[in-house]
């Protein structure tokens, strides 16, 4: 397991999309986290504050949003954690113990 934080210590914003659609008498909500290619794996599209504002603004032009999808990934600080973080009985600072 890894603990990921922004390289510059700011807040992480993840891009997502959602839709509400009716089925009979119930409205279903659906969400999806948007990803971008990152080496050989995929990771969420992480936005800075300006990217977050553009992503949430319904007036943002499509080409600007496409630019966010193609942007360089925001650097993250990666720390390997001990496996105790996988124990559902534990829910405290000890879960952030380095490996």
Walk through the language-model features, giving the residues of each.
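A structured binding-face within diverse protein domains that lines the active/interaction site
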Residues: 1-99
């Amino acid at each position: 397991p890894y603990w990921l934080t922004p390289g510059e210590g700011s807040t992480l914003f993840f891009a997502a999309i959602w839709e509400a659609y009716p089925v009979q008498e119930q409205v279903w909500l659906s969400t999806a986290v948007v990803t971008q290619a990152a080496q050989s794996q995929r990771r969420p599209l992480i936005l800075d504050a300006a990217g977050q504002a553009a992503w949430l603004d319904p007036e943002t032009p499509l080409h600007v949003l496409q630019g966010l999808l193609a942007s360089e990934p925001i650097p993250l600080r990666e720390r390997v954690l001990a496996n105790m973080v996988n124990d559902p009985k534990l829910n405290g600072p000890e879960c952030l113990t380095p490996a």
